[in-house]
């Protein structure tokens, strides 16, 4: 039995002639040398981000073929216009019913060791395939996934560009997704700009809000750690 859903539309990815320079992305110096951030950062740094690898990861992330019925991709719930989260209280999986939890945003994952809202998983390597295989989310058999991708016309070449040969397995799927996810970065927020200049650019109201946020009796930052 073919792993492809019979009659399903297969849309070739629309990729630029030159891949995006994912490998040249870096975090600000202040981030990389902040003692507090180092308590969270660096998890997964052993995985090199390459232009071809992250490009493959992006294609995988947005491809509905990774779901059992070819209707849901990772990007269906993790929408770029909402910081790779979702505006709905509960996203829709392949069942068509709202899931129990809101989709979390995806950015600066170098600084997130524990994942999912209940923090039950440590590291992207242990997380990225779970939504794909979850029966209510994407519902895909992980055992069947490599064969399904091999049968699609565009994946062998993309895997060869990323890894030197067209072999497809779960380890490479995981690696490519991690490369793309770790390339999603937000480093130019109003707070980042303030951090770089000692918060000289903050208004009086913003400084008061920052003080309340980090105060020992409010402890907002204990959960909202960035």
Each model region followed by its residue ranges:
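Periplasmic c-type cytochrome electron-transfer domains
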Residues: 1-226
């Amino acid at each position: 039995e073919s792993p492809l859903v019979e009659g399903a539309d297969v849309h070739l990815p629309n990729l630029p002639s030159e891949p995006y320079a994912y490998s040249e992305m870096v975090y600000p110096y202040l981030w990389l040398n902040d003692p507090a951030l180092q308590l969270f950062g660096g998890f997964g740094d052993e995985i090199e981000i390459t232009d071809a690898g992250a490009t493959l990861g992006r294609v995988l992330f947005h491809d509905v073929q990774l779901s059992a019925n070819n209707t849901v991709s990772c990007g269906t719930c993790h929408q770029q216009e909402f910081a790779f989260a979702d505006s709905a209280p509960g996203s829709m999986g392949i069942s068509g019913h709202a899931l129990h939890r809101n989709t979390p945003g995806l950015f600066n994952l170098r600084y997130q060791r524990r994942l999912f809202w209940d923090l039950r998983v440590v590291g992207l390597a242990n997380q990225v395939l779970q939504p794909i295989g979850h029966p209510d989310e994407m519902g895909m058999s992980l055992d069947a996934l490599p064969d399904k991708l091999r049968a699609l016309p565009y994946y062998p070449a993309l895997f060869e560009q990323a890894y030197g040969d067209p072999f497809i397995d779960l380890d490479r799927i995981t690696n490519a997704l991690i490369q793309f996810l770790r390339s999603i970065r937000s480093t130019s927020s109003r707070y980042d700009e303030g951090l770089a200049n000692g918060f000289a650019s903050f208004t009086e109201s913003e400084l008061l809000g920052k003080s309340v946020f980090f105060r020992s009796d409010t402890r907002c930052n204990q959960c909202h750690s960035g």
